[in-house]
Structure formats: structure tokens, C-alpha cells
């Protein structure tokens, strides 16, 4: 698994001894991630690494933060392909999440619901996604709280999919729907179901990861897959939602 590690249970934007706006990561809050196929997620994004250690060893330090809220160190790298990765370290253990910065920006809101997951709202869509700078997001919950308003770049990485006849665009996040019913962030995960008609396909080479990936345009939403698909095909995919924010903009 690429997404592993520990966080300070009382780390905040004002220092690790404060308690407001805390980032927490007890075992039950990260269990959902370990159940997901994170190796498949990274390989589909073109990161051809054997494990976390190899990824961290190869990660450039062009964006290197020390003492980020909840973490001892944060590394961020934006690949020319549009793919990016955020690596976060606490007490010698690392976690990493990918993001895709090649899609179109859209106005939206996002808040942090768990250490790595943000709840994104843009247009008519509301879904949980892996966030590229979770430590910079305001803590919120399903019944209220602060949200960060700005430009977001959502994307979905397909873990499995089927192609067929053209379809209307839909995106559903069953875990987010449950979250707003039971108010339990421990059950939240970034897995989504998406369907639509492929409006365009572009091949990309991940220079850092040495792998290739394809981006399908589904009504403006980038759907990342590991092989070439045909324009005009309908697709139904189960995948993981990502969200790039303005935090890392130059």
C-alpha cells in the first residue's frame, strides 16, 4: 500500500499542542484506505514504483514543507504530465496521495473530513476525494463547519470499468451519502461510481513515475485509465476521486 502512516492526533494550523481544527488519524479512520487498492491507483496514474520507499526516494524536493499542520514534513511534486503526488511524513512514516492538475478548474468548496479526505462540492456534485493538501483545509463535518471556497480540479482514477453504448453523465459517492446520514467519518472513503460518454482521450507519460496513462473527458471530468479507449464509447467505472486545490499553485 502507498497510503500508510501515522498522524499527530492534536496537530493544528496553530501548532501541534493546540486542539482546535485538529487532524486525527486513529486506526479506524485509515482502515478504509487500506481496503482500497492503492497500488492500482498509483500504477494507473503512471507511477511505476514498487513501494513507498522507492517513491519517496525518487520524489524531487522542489516543494518541501517542514512542520506542516499534523506532519513533520510534506513533499509535493507536479509532473509535466499533469499528474502530481503529495507525500506526508510523521515520525518517520510516510503517506502519499496522487492528484491530477491537468483538468479544467471549476469553482467549488472543500473541507477536511478525515486526515486525507476532503468533501468537495462543485456544480451539482458532492463527493469525497483524496485532497492534495489536506493539512491546509478547514476541518468540517456533515452538519456544518467552515469550507474553503475557490477553484478545484477534480478527477477520477478508474480501478475497474466497462465500456458500451453512450450514456448520460452521472457521478455518485455512496460513502458521502452514508456520511451525511450517519455522521461517521470513520466510514468515509473516496470511492465513486461514474458513467458517461467519452468526449476525448489523451495519452500522457508520467516522467517521474515512468509510466503511461490516458485521460478520458467525461462531460468535463477527467477519468484516468490505464489503456486507450475510443471517443464516443459509453463507460461505467468504479474508481477513486482526487481533488487538486489552489494550495500548490505557483
Language-model features, listed with the residues they occupy:
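N-terminal alpha-helical "arm" segments
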Residues: 1-55, 236
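Short, isolated positions in well-ordered beta-strands
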Residues: 3-4, 95, 127, 223
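Long, hydrophobic alpha/beta structural blocks
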Residues: 48-194
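Short nucleic-acid-contacting surface segments enriched for D/E, G, S/T with interspersed K/R
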Residues: 143-150, 224-240
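Beta-strand secondary-structure signal
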Residues: 195-197, 215-217, 238-240
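Short, Lys/Arg- and Gly-enriched loop/turn segments at beta-strand edges
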Residues: 242-250
Amino acid at each position: 500500500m502507498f497510503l500508510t502512516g501515522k498522524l499527530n492526533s492534536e496537530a493544528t494550523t496553530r501548532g501541534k499542542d493546540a486542539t482546535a481544527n485538529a487532524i486525527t488519524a486513529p486506526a479506524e479512520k485509515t482502515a478504509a484506505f487500506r481496503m482500497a487498492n492503492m497500488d492500482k491507483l498509483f500504477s494507473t496514474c503512471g507511477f511505476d514504483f514498487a513501494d513507498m520507499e522507492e517513491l519517496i526516494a525518487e520524489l524531487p524536493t522542489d516543494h518541501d514543507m517542514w512542520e506542516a499542520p499534523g506532519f513533520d514534513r510534506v513533499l509535493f511534486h507536479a509532473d509535466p504530465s499533469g499528474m502530481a503526488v503529495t507525500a506526508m511524513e510523521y515520525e518517520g512514516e510516510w503517506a502519499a496521495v496522487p492528484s491530477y492538475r491537468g483538468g479544467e478548474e471549476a469553482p467549488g468548496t472543500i473541507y477536511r473530513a478525515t486526515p486525507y479526505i476532503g468533501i468537495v462540492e462543485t456544480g451539482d456534485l458532492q463527493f469525497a476525494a483524496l485532497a492534495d493538501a489536506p493539512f491546509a483545509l478547514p476541518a468540517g463535518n456533515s452538519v456544518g463547519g467552515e469550507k474553503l471556497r475557490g477553484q478545484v480540479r477534480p478527477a477520477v482514477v478508474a480501478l475497474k470499468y466497462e465500456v458500451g453504448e453512450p450514456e448520460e453523465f452521472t457521478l455518485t459517492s455512496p460513502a458521502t451519502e452514508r456520511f451525511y446520514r450517519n455522521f461517521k467519518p470513520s466510514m468515509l472513503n473516496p470511492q465513486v461510481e461514474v458513467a458517461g460518454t467519452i468526449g476525448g482521450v489523451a495519452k500522457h507519460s508520467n516522467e517521474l513515475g515512468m509510466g503511461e496513462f490516458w485521460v478520458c473527458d467525461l462531460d468535463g471530468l477527467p477519468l484516468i485509465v490505464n489503456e486507450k479507449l475510443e471517443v464516443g464509447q459509453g463507460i461505467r467505472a468504479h474508481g477513486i476521486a482526487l481533488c487538486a486545490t489552489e494550495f500548490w499553485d505557483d
